[in-house]
A protein has these predicted regions:
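Short helix-boundary/re-entrant hairpin motifs in multi-pass inner-membrane proteins
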Residues: 83, 196-266, 293
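Hydrophobic alpha-helical transmembrane segments in multi-pass integral membrane proteins
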Residues: 44, 51-113, 239
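Interfacial segments of multi-pass membrane proteins
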Residues: 223, 303-313, 377-393
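Membrane-interface helix termini and inter-helical loops of multi-pass transporters
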Residues: 52-62, 174-189, 250-260, 375-384, ...
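Structural signature of hydrophobic alpha-helical transmembrane segments
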Residues: 2-12, 64-75, 118-131, 196-207, ...
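N-terminal signal-anchor/start-transfer transmembrane helix
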Residues: 7-27, 207-213
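Alpha-helical multi-pass transmembrane bundles of energy-transducing inner-membrane proteins
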Residues: 25, 97-104, 108-194, 208, ...
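Cytoplasmic/organellar membrane-interface segments at the starts of transmembrane helices
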Residues: 351, 407-523
Length: 523
């Protein structure tokens, strides 16, 4: 088991070294190596996840949680790889380094999940923040990427100071930083005021790293509408690592110090505030990418509430919060990226597929069946009611209704305003039936089916277009040029949709199987 977890850390790190070298031979080798690495990792995760169940029931809680987290990490990185392969131009400098850093991100996240002491956990999270800043810098050319990276480092600096202070105090009070030492101190009955305070400082810093939106919005990279979707997916991965660290530490404190009620209650209250604040903000945004970020923050609030509660049922709901946050937010971010390309061939592609995919992602984030987000909301509400936390349960239920209304309003805005309904029934031009002499007629046909301000050909007549000049001729022959590339653009969205659907439908059967096998509610 240890060798398997170690392979999840080392293989992406080794592949990250070869990506820039292979990209010099062929540009597309960068995303190919990254995609194959993540696909192989997912296969290597799925098989042991089911093989460990009947063999050793005593190791099931830790092993299943670790494999589940590693699977979500590889899933998020795989979706980011597929989308970035078509969003990042092949001529962009440093394009191969983006995929190399993405592989390194997966390695760091798996290392944080497998960490057995507080210092290693913080070290992985801190390096992950620096890698995320580097990926933001190369996600878009010019000053946009550099500004987003510098903002990210500036905002996370106070959080890093709090984490370092907490780890230093924890080392001075305990003598080491291992999880087992904290458990032994709790069982021995010694005074534990200083260790709990130190862990509180560490969790506060990680909370700031997971929810950067508490900082001023104009200085937050999460609210930069000019940042590409690849950058937002990178920030999602960085938040995922901080969210997991908070969850891991809070469960450890809850189970070790059963009478540390103040810390657990404070974490629950913080999660409830984050949930309410992000839900209300999602109702007032007009950009789909920003709405997806707010939905991700609301999932973080639910996760902190579940971690503060600390019951087996709330821990089970936290697993599906991770799944819903990872897949649902990715789905909405990709749909938001397609809406921005108003002068490219992907606009009609969005209106032919984006309506359904956006609705599916929004329903999952809102907790509507049959998607995985339904189980995360339902289990958390049941756990809160069962523990007597009725106010928190009502807030979680009301937030689902408000998030659903935000999704429906955003969908109505995108598909009914500004003549968007014209794109949904737009006919594609058969490229094989076109000749060089047909270019003027086809260009006229494109202009007739487009709004004046959204002329498809204008994006390729402009010298500042983000696409290469040698592809403008092929664009005039087919506004949806590159069938393979357009499906590559939609592949992570459909992949996330299938994960959400399968997670919601197969969960009862998987739960009954694990429950009958282990006889335990805590998976």
């Amino acid at each position: 088991m240890g060798n398997t977890i170690l392979s999840f850390i080392l293989i992406p790190a080794v592949a990250a070294v070869f990506v820039p070298v292979m990209a010099k031979v062929k540009t597309r080798m960068a995303e190919s190596i990254a995609g194959l690495t993540f696909l192989a990792g997912l296969v290597n995760i799925i098989v042991p996840l089911f093989l460990v169940v009947p063999s050793d029931t005593g190791r099931i809680p830790a092993d299943c949680m670790l494999f589940f987290t590693a699977g979500l990490i590889y899933l998020s990185c795989l979706c980011t790889t597929f989308y970035s392969a078509s969003e990042l131009e092949t001529s962009r400098p440093g394009r191969s380094y983006f995929f190399s850093l993405l592989l390194l991100t997966a390695s760091l996240l798996c290392g944080a999940a497998a960490a057995e002491n507080f210092f290693t956990l913080y070290l992985y999270i801190e390096v992950l923040g620096l890698v995320a800043a580097a990926m933001l810098a190369v996600s878009r050319s010019g000053t946009v990427g550099l500004t987003a990276a510098s903002d990210w480092i500036f905002i996370t600096l106070p959080a890093s100071v709090l984490c370092i202070a907490g780890i230093s105090l924890l080392f001075l009070s305990m003598g080491n930083l291992s999880y087992e030492s904290l458990k032994q101190m709790a069982l021995s009955g010694d005074p534990f005021g200083a260790p709990v305070f130190a862990v509180t400082l560490l969790m506060t810093g990680l909370l700031l790293k997971a929810c950067i939106f508490l900082m001023p919005q104009e200085r937050s990279s999460d609210f930069r509408t000019d940042l590409p979707v690849s950058g937002h997916l990178v920030l999602q991965l960085a938040r995922l690592g901080a969210m997991y660290a908070v969850f891991r530490i809070s469960i450890l404190i809850r189970f070790s110090f059963g009478n540390a009620a103040f810390l657990s209650s404070s974490l629950m209250f913080t999660g409830a505030v984050i949930l309410v604040w992000s839900t209300l903000c999602a109702l007032n945004v007009k950009d789909l990418k920003r709405m997806a970020c707010f939905f991700d923050f609301s999932n973080a609030g639910m996760l902190f509430t579940a971690a503060g509660l600390g019951t087996p049922l709330s821990v089970l709901s936290a697993l599906f919060i991770f799944l819903s946050s990872t897949s649902g937010t990715t789905l909405l971010l990709i749909c938001g990226g397609l809406t921005e390309r108003k002068k490219t061939r992907f606009q009609s592609l969005f209106y032919s597929h984006g309506s359904f995919l956006m609705l599916a992602g929004g329903l999952s984030q809102s907790g509507i069946p049959p998607f995985a987000g339904f189980w995360s909301r339902l289990l958390l509400v049941i756990a809160l009611f069962d523990s007597g936390r009725n106010v928190y349960a009502v807030l979680a239920a009301v937030s689902s209704v408000l998030m659903l209304s935000a999704v429906l309003r955003q969908r109505r805005k995108l598909f009914t305003e500004n003549g968007a309904e014209k794109y949904r029934n737009r006919q594609e031009i058969d490229k094989s039936a076109c000749t060089e002499s047909d270019r003027p007629a086809i260009k006229t046909e494109i202009e007739n089916h487009s709004n004046p301000e959204e002329d498809f050909s204008a994006g390729y007549q402009d010298e500042s277009s983000e696409y290469e000049p040698d592809r403008r001729k092929e664009f005039l022959l087919d506004p949806l040029y590159g069938n393979g590339e357009k499906w590559l653009k939609l592949l992570p969205a459909w992949f996330s949709f299938l994960i959400l659907l399968c997670g919601g439908i197969l969960f009862p059967f998987l739960y009954m199987y694990l429950h009958l096998t282990t006889g335990s509610l805590f998976l």
